[in-house]
Amino acid sequence: MSQQVIIFDTTLRDGEQALQASLSVKEKLQIALALERMGVDVMEVGFPVSSPGDFESVQTIARQVKNSRVCALARCVEKDIDVAAESLKVAEAFRIHTFIATSPMHIATKLRSTLDEVIERAIYMVKRARNYTDDVEFSCEDAGRTPIADLARVVEAAINAGATTINIPDTVGYTMPFEFAGIISGLYERVPNIDKAIISVHTHDDLGLAVGNSLAAVHAGARQVEGAMNGIGERAGNCSLEEVIMAIKVRKDILNVHTAINHQEIWRTSQLVSQICNMPIPANKAIVGSGAFAHSSGIHQDGVLKNRENYEIMTPESIGLNQIQLNLTSRSGRAAVKHRMDEMGYKESEYNLDNLYDAFLKLADKKGQVFDYDLEALAFIGKQQEEPEHFRLDYFSVQSGSNDIATAAVKLACGEEVKAEAANGNGPVDAVYQAINRITDYNVELVKYSLTAKGHGKDALGQVDIVANYNGRRFHGVGLATDIVESSAKAMVHVLNNIWRATEVEKELQRKAQHNENNKETV
């Protein structure tokens, strides 16, 4: 009988560290709920002590996620563990994940300590975390470069202190698969109490071996794999969860393990993470790339037509990718749109049907036929922008030509007031952005601009993703339209609304902090 491998997702913690712009609480929650639908066992959603915003996002997710265990990261520091517990206490089930470096290099140069002191600190902090929960994970940072005898000492001590999961990270992506498997096997041989904890692995892709190392560790006895959707993360990224999950499913014959993942949700979750994080998926990416199930060779095409198993070790349907494209028109009713969303696997709670149908009709009037990829793009943008907007694009007009200076006129609703400005720029998009900056006085600096066609043909929707700097922070915005300048303007307005909301949240947190301080003085 096969054993279950626990899937531990760190997209919202380790994965987010790679992003050019921080995610909002709403965006993090959207990803967390998708991960819950996909069936991850544990999701690590933040580092609460790092900032009030991270604390709030962990607390919000912990309150709303019911079917996955929510986890927060903490260094082996008292305050870290206490703050993590405070952010998680609203959850139905939670885990505290604490860590400390164990390699000679890290101990000597980073911690300026000794192995004995590290073990003593680990014991104390694991016990402190156990005061808050029975589910405590302990990680040996840089375990891949820690001598096996030292690693075994730390692991044994952490388990004795109450750690229920022991994580063995290849923090810098240094080890080879056969080497990493040897580390796991070595721990099983050397640690007498190892049966009292689940052995976990956390691998990085610096040498392109993250997935290989994780699978080698599973083969050697590890029963939890940590990773991120699409492999996002520090430097070259984390272990790609979708790759590990499907490798376990496809090669059950040799690994003899399974996961509790709903494989039908993999593709949608991957696409959502890509969109929200503004990190496009390479076409040749295993499992979820657009070319993962494409066959261009005539020999391969002939073989697939005769029997898909000739050249496909899994099907697009096995990851939830429905390749049947049904087109709708402006004559299609709300029921038809809802029916198509149902067929694509979307629940009503994931989108606002009224808003989606309004956007669908406007698009159908422009391009005639609306396809599945159009609907998905409209649903995504609608979800991103469904909160009340302080800024709203009311009107814009652009004049430009090969020998003309681009000029834009923009009218923007700012709360209850409508303001208008005109400006010149280096092209129509820049002119629109200059006019918007004049209206708001936010003076944002554009850091990144990317345009992606959502669909096919000359009438495809254009999605613009931008990253902008404001007061030392980076904000992401997205816009969608058949007109590139319009989608660019909408993306900047989305950035402005994100800045406004972040500013309002900071003001509210400051008010609460001041209120608490006043109460202390009164007492």
Swiss-Prot record:
Chain spans, region Regulatory domain: 392-523
Catalytic reaction list: 3-methyl-2-oxobutanoate + acetyl-CoA + H2O = (2S)-2-isopropylmalate + CoA + H(+)
Listed EC numbers: 2.3.3.13
Domain Pyruvate carboxyltransferase as annotated: residue spans: 5-267
Molecular function via GO: 2-isopropylmalate synthase activity; acetyl-CoA C-acetyltransferase activity; manganese ion binding
Transmembrane segments: none
Entry keyword Acyltransferase: no
Entry's family note: Belongs to the alpha-IPM synthase/homocitrate synthase family. LeuA type 1 subfamily.
Subunit field text: Homodimer.
Protein's name in the database: 2-isopropylmalate synthase
Gene that produces this protein: leuA
